[in-house]
């Protein structure tokens, strides 16, 4: 794109493109985007003359077309929801485990916002069989050339022009590819039971386009009904209310509008246990008892979340413990949170992950980032609320405050490593609001939107009146933007209006917080009493003449041990002999907690302990959680003596990984250059 095109789209991205929409008020009401005109005038009064920009529109539009560019509203989506928006999907799948494909039919109910002659959707490696109106009228369509990692633009020609407020129903028959990036097909030997195959999906951020033609952008939310045909012995679950399961057919309904990335499907031979009045846990038989015990407090977490955020609106809150190859700690699919089996620590010490996914029921699922440039609006808010809710479960107010601050300090540790070691403090991906033009959302995934975003909200809370005042703001914010998608400017405008008259707002350096790389400009004054014992022990470990015993850490909580290990990662490596002695005396080698195991393995790798290389490779081969796998592989890569062995191990296991894991690890191991 030319310099003028870049300048235009960067500085007035949404208002300029919306100037093409005749029926603006209708578009605003659908997409939840308001006051674009005011924003346009504010952003451009000292930049370009309005009429010069208007004349440049044709140039920008032509360049989009020539380049096969993605859409104006979302740099990661071909779709054009400012022209027509999907409101409801009727979906059916026939599952073929042998061919590893879904045979699908979708009926899209589309509301027209502009005068249009076609509808544009996202696809990725879909075999489109036919497209027709619901009355049977065949429609012509064209699949654009594939754009690597983004798929192909599907343009569906309408038999006649459609006008604003008109509704269309378009029926599409399609098959997914065996290589669909949203799906992982597991052979029986990759499951706990070793007898039956398994299928699960991961659509976030932009992989829903590989399992159905859709507007694969979080700016669009739709309700859905689904029907899935699978072998009789299999249980089918989705991100929706399960209605009926008769023989080999299961039906679902999701009456709350969701973005495409929250569409989810899992099929396996599963069992369930009741956790509470609105919750079950699902897993393979071999894991069900451990899972039920580990997540027994789910209802307690839900009730604590409701006290802070208001009523839970998704009816049921089930958990599905997936096979180890699942790449995340959890995924907040509505009605059915997906979780990794690495949470089954046997001590409920990783309950914060469940609280995190529960909080997404409000921040992310109800109130959603408009595109993934504003991902912090999902994850930063969720981490912020997660820590408040987890702390609220502690009866003593002082201990509650200390616990919240301690977990915030753990997050700050991880943020510092991400910014200073992994990405680099000058990396544009360390900004809270990133630019995803020519950057895939999977490449932008890091701790930054989680921890920098949460830290920003904590800073605002401390500045603007404390928890009681800020809790009221949060409830107001969640209520106002419920069922909508928004961007950072809209959040900022709402906060400024809510706290108008508060003189301390003038202290906020919005530009540094939102748009500058590196660590945050301000670090809140956290209570450090829970880290004092850890820091004292760290000083002892770093002393040249000292002895160690289990008594040193006997009173530590699992998270204090994690704090200690993270501190050891952040400093110069210890001598191998001292490290081995610590592992024995502190019984770290015996831990079943994966948060402890993975950090200990990293410490050993960084100290070049050859005896632990096999353990590290076995660990990354056994489970696929990227939080663990990526840092270990990066550390192995940095150790030149074992680099080739690490690469060979990855290549041998790549066929068994989910797409997002293999995709990011290839970059970590410099295999995609």
Identify the residue ranges that each predicted region occupies.
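Hydrophobic pocket-lining residues within nucleotide cofactor-binding pockets
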Residues: 126, 257, 343-344, 605
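Long, ordered, helix-rich scaffold segments
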Residues: 446-453, 470, 478-487, 496-673
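Hydrophobic alpha-helical and helix-loop surface patches within well-folded domains
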Residues: 252, 281-544
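Acidic/His-enriched low-complexity segments
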Residues: 2-20, 28-32, 40, 47-315, ...
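Short loop/turn hinge sites at secondary-structure boundaries
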Residues: 268, 387, 395, 571-572, ...
């Amino acid at each position: 794109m030319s310099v003028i095109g870049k300048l235009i789209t960067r500085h007035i991205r949404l208002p300029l493109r919306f100037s093409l929409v005749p029926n603006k008020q209708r578009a605003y009401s659908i997409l939840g985007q308001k006051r674009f005109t005011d924003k346009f005038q504010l952003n451009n009064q000292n930049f370009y003359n309005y009429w010069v920009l208007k004349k440049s529109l044709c140039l920008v539009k032509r360049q989009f077309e020539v380049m096969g560019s993605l859409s104006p509203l979302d740099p990661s989506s071909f779709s054009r929801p400012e022209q027509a928006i999907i409101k409801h999907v009727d979906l059916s799948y026939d599952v073929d485990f042998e061919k590893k494909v879904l045979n699908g039919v979708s009926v899209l109910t589309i509301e027209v916002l502009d005068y249009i002659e076609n509808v544009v959707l996202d696809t990725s490696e879909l075999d489109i069989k036919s497209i027709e109106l619901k009355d049977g009228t065949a429609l012509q369509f064209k699949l654009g050339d594939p754009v690597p990692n983004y798929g192909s633009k599907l343009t569906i020609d309408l038999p006649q022009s459609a006008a604003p407020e008109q509704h269309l129903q378009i029926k599409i028959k399609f098959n997914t590819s065996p290589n669909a990036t949203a799906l992982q097909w597991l052979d029986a030997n990759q499951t706990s039971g070793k007898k039956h195959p398994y299928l699960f999906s991961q659509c976030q951020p932009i992989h829903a386009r590989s399992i159905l033609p859709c507007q694969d952008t979080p700016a669009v939310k739709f309700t859905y009904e689904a029907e899935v045909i699978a072998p009789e012995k299999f249980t089918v679950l989705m991100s929706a209310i399960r209605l009926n399961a008769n023989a080999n057919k299961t039906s679902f309904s999701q009456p709350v509008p969701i973005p495409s990335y929250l569409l989810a499907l899992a099929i396996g031979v599963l069992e369930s246990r009741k956790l509470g009045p609105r919750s079950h846990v699902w897993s393979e038989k071999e894991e069900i008892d451990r899972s039920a015990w580990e997540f027994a407090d789910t209802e307690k977490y839900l009730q604590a979340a409701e006290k802070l955020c208001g009523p839970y609106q998704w009816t049921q809150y089930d958990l599905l413990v997936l096979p180890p190859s699942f790449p995340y700690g959890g995924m907040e699919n509505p009605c059915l949170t997906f979780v990794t089996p690495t949470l089954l620590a046997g001590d409920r010490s990783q309950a914060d992950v469940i609280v995190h996914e529960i909080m997404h029921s409000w921040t992310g699922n109800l109130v959603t980032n408009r595109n993934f440039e504003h991902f912090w609006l999902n994850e930063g808010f969720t981490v912020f609320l997660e820590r408040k809710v987890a702390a609220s479960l502690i009866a003593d107010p002082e201990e509650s405050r200390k616990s919240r601050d301690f977990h915030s300090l753990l997050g700050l540790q991880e943020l510092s490593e991400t910014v200073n070691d992994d990405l680099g403090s000058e990396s544009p991906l360390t900004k809270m609001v990133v630019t995803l033009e020519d950057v895939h959302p999977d490449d932008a995934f890091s701790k930054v939107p989680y921890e920098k975003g949460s830290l920003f909200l904590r800073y605002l809370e401390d500045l603007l009146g404390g928890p009681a005042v800020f809790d009221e703001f949060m409830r107001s914010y969640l209520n106002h933007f419920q069922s909508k998608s928004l961007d950072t400017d809209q959040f900022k405008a709402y906060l400024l209006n809510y706290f108008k008259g508060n003189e301390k707002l003038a202290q906020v350096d919005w530009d540094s917080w939102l748009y500058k790389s590196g660590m945050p400009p301000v670090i809140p004054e956290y209570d450090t009493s829970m880290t004092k014992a850890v820091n004292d022990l760290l000083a002892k470990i770093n002393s040249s003449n000292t002895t160690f015993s289990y008594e040193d850490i006997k009173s530590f909580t699992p998270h204090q041990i994690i704090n200690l290990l993270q501190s050891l990662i952040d400093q110069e490596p210890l001598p191998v002999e001292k490290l081995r002695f610590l592992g024995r005396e502190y019984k770290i080698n015996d831990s079943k907690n994966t948060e402890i195991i993975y950090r200990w393995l990293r410490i050993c790798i960084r100290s070049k302990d050859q005896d632990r290389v096999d353990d590290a490779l076995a660990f990354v081969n056994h489970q696929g959680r990227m939080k663990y796998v990526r840092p270990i592989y990066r550390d192995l890569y940095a150790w030149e003596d074992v680099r080739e062995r690490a690469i060979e191990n990855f290549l041998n296991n790549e066929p068994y990984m989910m797409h997002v894991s293999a995709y990011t690890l290839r970059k970590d191991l410099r295999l995609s250059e």
